[in-house]
Amino acid sequence: MKYDTSELCDIYQEDVNVVEPLFSNFGGRASFGGQIITVKCFEDNGLLYDLLEQNGRGRVLVVDGGGSVRRALVDAELARLAVQNEWEGLVIYGAVRQVDDLEELDIGIQAMAAIPVGAAGEGIGESDVRVNFGGVTFFSGDHLYADNTGIILSEDPLDIE
């Protein structure tokens, strides 16, 4: 499904929170949306592998990487795992790498920057926790919509049709 965050903001102005414009689109989908699962991890993506092995249909993984752009939390291998398990998208408050490969994949990926250095894989972090970045607080179960214009968040799903 295609989402237009500008149109959604016009219709649901009182019901959405708008994430500050810190992110760029690195995935092959221009827009994506779904119910979110939150993760907090710093320069370590081991926990992301565990989560992205689950069925992601209708879901978006929101990762608070502490805003670090020193190590990439998502690479092509991890993004392919997300595609294989039907995740709608990834929002990374941090960095990604292998961007030429990422843009070929049928998944939305919003991140702050790209860097060639990969993350550790120790599995340090926590999931289903409140995370805060970009002026917005995210809770697992909220609904996120993203396109090339921006990212918005709603407690309840928005009626798109």
Swiss-Prot record:
Q: Tell me where the transmembrane regions lie.
A: none
- One of the GO BP terms on file: negative regulation of RNA catabolic process
Q: What CDD domains does this protein's entry cite?
A: RraA_family (cd16841)
Listed Pfam families: RraA-like
Tell me which Gene3D superfamilies the record gives.
Ribonuclease E inhibitor RraA/RraA-like
Offer an example of a GO molecular function term for this protein. ribonuclease inhibitor activity
**Where is it localised?**
Cytoplasm
Cross-referenced InterPro entries: RraA (IPR010203), RraA/RraA-like (IPR005493), RraA/RraA-like_sf (IPR036704), RraA_gpbac (IPR014339)
Any one cellular-component term (Gene Ontology): cytosol
Q: What induces it?
A: Induced upon entry into stationary phase, in a RpoS-dependent manner. Stability of the rraA transcript is Rne dependent, suggesting the existence of a feedback mechanism in the regulation of RraA level.
Record key words, sorted: Cytoplasm
How it assembles, according to the record, is: Homotrimer. Forms a ring-like structure with a central cavity. Binds to both RNA-binding sites in the C-terminal region of Rne and to RhlB.
Q: What else is known?
A: RraA and RraB interact with Rne at separate sites within the Rne and exert distinct effects on the composition of the degradosome, affecting distinct sets of RNA transcripts.
What exactly does this protein do? Globally modulates RNA abundance by binding to RNase E (Rne) and regulating its endonucleolytic activity. Can modulate Rne action in a substrate-dependent manner by altering the composition of the degradosome. Modulates RNA-binding and helicase activities of the degradosome.
Q: What PANTHER family does this protein's entry cite?
A: 4-HYDROXY-4-METHYL-2-OXOGLUTARATE ALDOLASE 3-RELATED (PTHR33254), REGULATOR OF RIBONUCLEASE ACTIVITY A (PTHR33254:SF29)
Q: Which family does it belong to?
A: Belongs to the RraA family.
This chain's protein is named: Regulator of ribonuclease activity A
